Design a protein with these regions (language model features):
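A short, charged helix-loop
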Residues: 40-58, 65, 69, 73-100
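Glycine-rich nucleotide/cofactor/substrate-binding loop typically near the N-terminus or early
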Residues: 7, 11-12, 16-45
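Active-site loops and adjacent core secondary-structure elements that bind or stabilize anionic groups
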Residues: 13-14, 88, 92-162
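Single conserved hydrophobic/aromatic residue that forms the stacking wall/gate
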Residues: 1-10, 15, 160-167
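Short coil/turn connectors at secondary-structure junctions
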Residues: 11, 32-37, 57-60, 66, ...
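Solvent-exposed alpha-helices and their adjacent loops that cap or buttress functional pockets
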Residues: 7, 27-33, 52-53, 63-64, ...
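A generic local structural motif
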Residues: 1-2, 24-26, 69
């Protein structure tokens, strides 16, 4: 059985401002230490369902539950916690930590946006797979679609946006 430990999520979610006495007292009472950086690689659901003739049981087994919980709780508390879901950022983050000793708030916010997009795309892949495999029952009320950025473009959008086609 898998279990999500409240103390672990609490370590990510705690508000660290000294004037938030309630959070500080709860952390001390439960022996919770704050976490500054969370790195999560979700179960390979999309890679699993891309295999020919994948069994439903294999697909279901590769739906991550605890990982998205960790990602979302860290992303929500980006004022204090950095969340990394993309291994391409590892070297850049290590460089920042060596130089500054921490990740700057604007970078943590950018990582949080990427993390929420990552879990949304992950959940979209699950819904789309299940909708194609299990044809009976109610249809989800929302239509979900997720696209990966293919490249940056120089022209094609409003001045304050960054144009990029999606695949």
């Amino acid at each position: 059985a898998y279990e999500i430990m409240p103390s672990l999520v609490g370590s990510e979610m705690c508000i660290r401002d000294s004037d938030n006495a309630e959070h500080q007292a709860a952390m001390e009472e439960h022996g919770i230490l704050p976490i500054d950086l969370v790195v999560v690689n979700l179960y390979p659901f999309r890679e699993t369902i891309a295999k020919p003739n994948v069994a439903l049981e294999d697909a279901i087994e590769n739906i991550d539950i605890g990982g998205p919980t960790m990602v979302r709780s860290a992303a929500k508390n980006n004022a204090y916690v950095g969340i990394v879901v993309n291994p391409d950022h590892y070297d850049e983050i290590l460089g920042m930590l060596r130089t500054n000793g921490e990740l700057m708030q604007d970078y943590r916010f950018a990582l949080a946006k990427e993390a929420f997009a990552h879990t949304a795309a992950y959940d979209t892949a699950i819904v789309n797979y299940m909708s194609g495999v299990i044809g009976e029952g109610p249809t989800p009320p929302e239509y979900l679609s997720a696209y990966e950025k293919v490249m940056d473009l120089r022209y094609g959008c409003l001045l304050y946006t960054s144009p990029s086609p999606r695949d």
